[in-house]
Amino acid sequence: METILSLSGVSWRHKVRDFSSWKPWAKRDGAGIYSVDLEIKSGTILGLIGPNGAGKTTLMRAICGLYDCEGFDKSSETRRVEIGYMPEQVRWEGRITVKQALSSIAMMREDSVDVGNLIQTVGLASKSDQMLDSLSQGMRQRLSLACALIGKPRLLVMDEPLNGLD
């Protein structure tokens, strides 16, 4: 099987306020991920399990290039195009429809996806002309999944994808 993602010694530390300093803006290294080695091959299904604060979301965000981690090339074009990311929560708001939102995102990603088919795939066919403000939390999760699927990514990273699903 083909390797689609490889990490070697990847680390990231969140910056937190340093209350021991007399400077109110001072920051220090907080929790994070340390020296992660990971290889994901095509067709692999991988789950991250651990207690709150273990670094699962941090690792997922690092994989997607949202953090500038040590030992990881965030600038890779592959990362932008070939990874679909579904965050734990997205605040879908606004006076546009589900269909308009997905069409706009597809345009930004320079992808000519069949939005109607994508809406059908994630179970939002009956909601395609509804405004984002009127969607339930479960419908918003489905919309996030649809966004992650735009571009037919080779790697799909989902952070608590079933949270709030109807």
Describe the residue ranges of each PLM region.
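Catalytic Walker B motif of ABC-type/P-loop ATPase nucleotide-binding domains
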Residues: 156-160, 165
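Helix-to-loop junction immediately C-terminal to a conserved catalytic motif
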Residues: 64
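Q-loop/switch helix immediately C-terminal to the Walker
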Residues: 89, 94-108
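Conserved ABC ATPase signature
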Residues: 131-138
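The feature captures the beta-strand-to-loop junction immediately N-terminal to the Walker
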Residues: 49-51
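Hydrophobic anchor residue at the start of the ABC signature
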Residues: 145
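Conserved ABC ATPase "signature" region
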Residues: 103, 112-127
